[in-house]
């Protein structure tokens, strides 16, 4: 026998099983059960505080909600598809515990402001976790950077050797990206930490509710100023998905370089066995599957952002059933982002840096060409002319399989008689890196300064 719908008073026929299954959201919004109970507790306490409900009725409801909280914590609650969503399921379970007085809980409240409140609470809590995990990753980056301040490697543009840099400097570039991610999520908290509770269906309520009371109970910083906006706003969700997409993009870029650099052709790093997998047919394989998975999962989060933008783009005010589609993407994004951060931090912390291979790559290429052009410019040669001269020398080196350091001093003196033996020191990769002392540059002192500032930021 079908369960009678709590909203079924004006209907003469029951809905079909297919409609029930298609419209039900309990399969995923059960993830907000904790938040739904928290919101209901705040609401009933407010109803008691304002004398909308008697103390006796309110206390019975509060006691029943606490029982459900305990059962939820112990995994003892069972939800029904026929009851549609988490709100109806909780009310039904509460009725089983305390009887018909449970029906008074929904006084001065709609599922519209109820679900909005649940989602705000859910995301508010997860934002803190995401920010903490980013900071944990930053700590690993700082540790690894400190170990590799003087590790010299090729810097790339267009994936071609450009100029030698410090590997620590490279790592600190990602530290800055993740710091911007933190700042975006912190701003996201401002728009998430607002209470929609009390907006009711869309127009507020005739009951003398106290929205400030419930906001304080739920530790919200602010209250929606407009009831229509309160129940229809999903900007805070879009902000989260946008921020999560940018964060995953940063992780994906980092993963791409890890995947390249642990290959035989590069050999700059080696991943720990703990974060690698093998092949079912090729015994020699050690695959960077975790890095590849994180790179792949970035597209998953992008998809959730695009889907919700498409859902929201034509919705008239206020609530529409389309908004049921706002949750699965958020839940999945949370379940994607947090493990990705944890796994990446562990992968980075345990990888081995092949310092000799990195340095060797800078000593048998032409990434010191800019150093030579700068050196010639200090001898009075206009930089554009120096650039052309060095370009010709590079071409000749490629033709003859020699480097700029192989060119004899006599050849250099033909370019400018003031060139001395010191030119060969300037062409050394480590010297080239050391000399870049401009603020934010790759010079060792500058990298140490970046690390010092990061430690201060992280309270290390």
Curated annotation (Swiss-Prot):
Localization per Swiss-Prot or TrEMBL: Cytoplasm
Catalysed transformations (reactions): 2-(N(omega)-L-arginino)succinate = fumarate + L-arginine
PROSITE patterns for this protein: FUMARATE_LYASES
Source organism, top-level taxon: Bacteria
Species in which this protein is naturally found: Ligilactobacillus salivarius (strain UCC118) (Lactobacillus salivarius)
Residue ranges of coiled coil: none
Residue ranges of the TM segments: none
Pfam entry (one): Lyase_1
Record carries keyword Amino-acid biosynthesis: yes
Keywords: Amino-acid biosynthesis, Arginine biosynthesis, Cytoplasm, Lyase
Entry-linked HAMAP family: Arg_succ_lyase (MF_00006)
Upper classification of the organism: Bacteria, Bacillati, Bacillota, Bacilli, Lactobacillales
Gene Ontology molecular function terms on file: argininosuccinate lyase activity
Stored InterPro entries: Arg_succ_lyase_C (IPR029419), Argininosuccinate_lyase (IPR009049), Fumarase/histidase_N (IPR024083), Fumarate_lyase_CS (IPR020557), Fumarate_lyase_fam (IPR000362), Fumarate_lyase_N (IPR022761), L-Aspartase-like (IPR008948)
EC class of the enzyme, as a word: lyase
Family per record: Belongs to the lyase 1 family. Argininosuccinate lyase subfamily.
GO cellular component, one term: cytosol
CDD domains, per the entry: Argininosuccinate_lyase
Gene3D superfamilies with a match to the protein in the record: Fumarase/aspartase (C-terminal domain) (1.10.40.30), Fumarase/aspartase (Central domain) (1.20.200.10), Fumarase/aspartase (N-terminal domain) (1.10.275.10)
Protein name, per record: Argininosuccinate lyase
Record-listed E.C. numbers: 4.3.2.1
Gene Ontology process terms (BP): arginine biosynthetic process via ornithine; L-arginine biosynthetic process
Protein's pathway: Amino-acid biosynthesis; L-arginine biosynthesis; L-arginine from L-ornithine and carbamoyl phosphate: step 3/3
């Amino acid at each position: 026998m079908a369960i009678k719908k709590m909203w079924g008073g004006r209907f003469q026929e029951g809905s079909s099983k297919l409609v029930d299954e298609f419209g039900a959201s309990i399969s995923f919004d059960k993830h907000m059960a904790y938040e739904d109970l928290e919101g209901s507790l705040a609401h009933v306490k407010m109803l008691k505080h304002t004398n909308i409900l008697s103390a006796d009725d309110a206390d019975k409801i509060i006691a029943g909600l606490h029982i459900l909280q305990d059962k939820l914590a112990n995994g003892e609650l069972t939800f029904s598809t026929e009851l549609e969503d988490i709100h109806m399921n909780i009310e039904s379970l509460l009725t089983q515990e305390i009887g018909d007085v449970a029906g008074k809980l929904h006084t001065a409240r709609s599922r519209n402001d109820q679900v909005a409140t649940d989602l705000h609470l859910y995301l508010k809590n997860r934002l803190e976790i995401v920010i903490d995990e980013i900071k944990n990753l930053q700590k690993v980056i700082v540790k690894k950077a400190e170990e590799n301040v003087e590790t010299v490697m090729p810097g790339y543009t267009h994936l071609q050797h450009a100029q030698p840099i410090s590997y620590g400097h490279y790592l600190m570039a990602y530290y800055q990206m993740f710091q911007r991610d933190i700042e975006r999520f912190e701003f996201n908290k401002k728009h998430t930490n607002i209470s929609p509770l009390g907006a009711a269906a869309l127009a507020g309520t005739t009951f003398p509710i106290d929205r400030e009371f419930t906001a304080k109970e739920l530790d919200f910083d602010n209250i929606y100023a407009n009831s229509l906006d309160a129940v229809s706003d999903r900007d805070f969700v879009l902000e989260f998905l946008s921020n999560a997409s940018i964060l995953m993009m940063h992780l994906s870029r980092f993963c791409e370089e890890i995947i390249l650099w642990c290959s035989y052709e590069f050999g700059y790093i080696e991943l720990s066995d703990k974060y690698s997998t093998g092949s079912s047919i090729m015994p020699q394989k050690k695959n960077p599957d975790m890095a590849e998975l994180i790179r792949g999962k970035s597209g998953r989060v992008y998809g959730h952002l695009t889907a919700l933008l498409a859902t929201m783009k034509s919705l008239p005010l206020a609530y529409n059933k389309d908004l049921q589609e706002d949750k699965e993407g958020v839940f999945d994004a949370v379940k994607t982002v947090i493990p990705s951060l944890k796994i990446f931090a562990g992968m980075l912390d345990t990888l081995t840096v092949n310092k000799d291979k990195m340095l060797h790559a800078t000593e048998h290429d032409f990434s010191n060409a800019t150093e030579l052009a700068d050196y010639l410019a200090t001898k009075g040669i206009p930089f554009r002319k120096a650039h052309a001269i060095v370009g010709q020398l590079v071409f000749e080196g490629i033709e003859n399989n020699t480097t700029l350091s192989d060119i004899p001093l006599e050849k250099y003196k033909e370019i400018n008689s003031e060139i001395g033996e010191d030119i060969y020191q300037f062409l050394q990769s480590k010297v080239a890196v050391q000399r870049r002392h401009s603020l934010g540059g790759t010079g060792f002192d500058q990298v140490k300064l970046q690390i010092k500032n990061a430690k201060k930021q992280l309270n290390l």
